[in-house]
Amino acid sequence: KGVNGIETCRSGFNGAGGINTYKSTSDGYYSLAGGGATDIRLIGGNWDNLQSLLSRIIVAGGGGGGSGNSHDSIGHGGGTKGKDGISIANKYFAGGGSQFQGGLTFNSLYNGSFGVSGAGDGISGVGGGGGWYCGAGSFYAEFGGGGSGYILTKDSYKPANYSPSSKYYFSDINSVVGGNTTKQDGYAKITLLQALPFLTISSYNST
């Protein structure tokens, strides 16, 4: 929450939409960047490197940012499509990302795209959530759109120049939107299904 009259600018983590220059007010308005995605990718580098984004095989979508005001729909992330962020009057909305495109809103400047969310701007502006395709941001949607999740399978959508091969395909998958059984957005939990063998560590001194 900004101090009255202070202009702030916040960037988002791993695809989340940041907040452009925003001037807080004595009314206590505040805006939040979107939540970042968590992903497993095969090629490293900067988070927004296109080649790296095109190597993602699992993505947990982040939730859209919130302005703290009333709303009809919270932009949870994850699942095959992120939830839309909708204001209480349904006058403004920020769409969630899907498997095929980023979230859309009334102004294309705030639309989400592949791996990059729409930014927020203005009073109560909000950023979209990071994801496979990211959510839209807005200057007054009260909640940004959530980013979509992704799991690579034989039948999953694969954009042009997508690099992982069939040896990385998953089966028997379940993609869940945040805010349901998980109660959270944009996180990954790794469970060890088989005990690792004991490791023998040897050391030596070179002369």
Model-derived segments and their meaning:
Residues K1-K91:
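Secretome/extracellular-domain signature
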Residues I19-S31, G36-W47, D72-H76, T80, ...:
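Catalytic nucleophile loop of clan PA
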Residues R41-G44, L152-K154, K189-L196:
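Short beta-strand-to-coil "C-cap" segments at the C-terminal boundary of structured domains/repeats
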Residues H76-G103, L109-G118, L193-T207:
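Terminal export signals
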Residues P159-N161:
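Eukaryotic low-complexity intrinsically disordered regions
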Residues P164-S203:
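A recurrent domain-boundary module in secreted/ectodomain proteins
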